[in-house]
């Protein structure tokens, strides 16, 4: 395994979606992540199975392994079941500093109102509520996300940039460079093909869930994207890949492979 200090001081976290088989077992996901050598982890909140016991188990694994929780996901605005309060409480209990939110609400104002409410719930825990834009949701691009965030009067609101969704939405790196960097408390990094298999919502979802590539293995200029952010900004490595799931059925081997290849990509870009 490559040494961390050879390549970058950036904190790297394994996104929970890289091992979707463990969505209902977040404590084991933390163990797998730490065992593979990651210094930080994502946490998936499953509404059906999460309990106070889950919070204790996840927190214990985080503390025992000396890793940090970069984020917890996901709050879906527009669904009839409101997971916001429960997820924020869980994030506070395990020490996650950011919460990922997506929206299917019909207007900027509706989304902003819900974000404002979530920010008020999360503020005491020093947690940032991060709106992610995706072409197949109501908030489709960085410009959409900026319009929403303008309507939120809260210091703990942010925007989550995922390189795949940046590319698919037509958002440019120049647009990112003109923004207040404080809007981006962490970033999701990966790579991808120059074009998705198609532009329908279902095809874009498949692109996001199954077809991602390791940074530097695709056509999305992952190195340039990485260079846009100071090294104190954590990167969540969001390589959701059906081929990797098939090649590495062992979870720790998969996590270790993604880490090694990501560190190699950072070494190339330095």
Model segments located where?
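Histidine-acidic metal/acid-base catalytic patches
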Residues: 1-18, 23-37, 63, 85, ...
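Acidic/glycine-enriched edge-of-secondary-structure segments
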Residues: 10-16, 68-75
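Active-site-proximal loop/turn and secondary-structure-junction residues that shape catalytic pockets
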Residues: 18-20, 45-49, 75-78, 104-107, ...
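Charged, low-complexity surface patches
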Residues: 22, 51, 80, 111, ...
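Active-site acidic/histidine proton-transfer and metal-coordination neighborhood
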Residues: 25-31, 65-68, 74-159, 168
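Glycine-rich, proline-tolerant flexible connector loops at the mouths of alpha/beta enzymes
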Residues: 40-63
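Conserved beta-strand positions in the central sheet of alpha/beta enzyme cores
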Residues: 42, 71, 100, 130, ...
């Amino acid at each position: 395994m490559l040494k961390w200090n050879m390549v970058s001081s950036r904190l790297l976290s394994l996104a929970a979606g890289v091992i979707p088989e463990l969505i209902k077992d977040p404590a084991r996901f933390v163990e797998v992540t730490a065992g593979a050598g990651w210094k930080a982890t994502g946490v998936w909140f499953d509404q059906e199975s999460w309990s106070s016991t889950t919070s204790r188990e996840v927190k214990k694994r985080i503390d025992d392994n000396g890793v940090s929780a970069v984020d917890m996901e996901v709050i879906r605005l527009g669904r009839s079941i409101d997971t916001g309060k429960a997820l924020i409480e869980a994030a506070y209990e395990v020490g996650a500093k950011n919460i990922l939110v997506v929206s299917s609400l019909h207007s900027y104002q509706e989304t902003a109102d819900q974000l404002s409410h979530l920010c008020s719930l999360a503020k005491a825990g020093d947690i940032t509520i991060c709106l992610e834009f995706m072409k197949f949701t109501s908030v489709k691009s960085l410009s959409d996300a900026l319009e929403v965030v303008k309507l939120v009067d809260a210091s703990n609101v942010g925007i989550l940039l995922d390189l795949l969704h940046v590319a698919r939405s037509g958002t440019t790196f120049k647009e990112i460079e003109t923004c207040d960097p404080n809007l981006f408390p962490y970033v999701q990094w990966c790579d991808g093909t120059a074009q998705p298999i198609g532009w329908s919502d279902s095809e874009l979802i498949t692109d996001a869930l199954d077809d991602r590539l390791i940074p530097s293995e695709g056509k999305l200029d992952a190195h340039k994207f990485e260079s846009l952010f100071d090294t104190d900004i954590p990167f969540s490595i969001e390589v959701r890949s059906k081929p990797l799931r098939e090649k590495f059925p062992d979870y720790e081997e998969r996590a270790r492979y993604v880490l090694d290849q990501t560190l190699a990509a950072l070494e190339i870009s330095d």
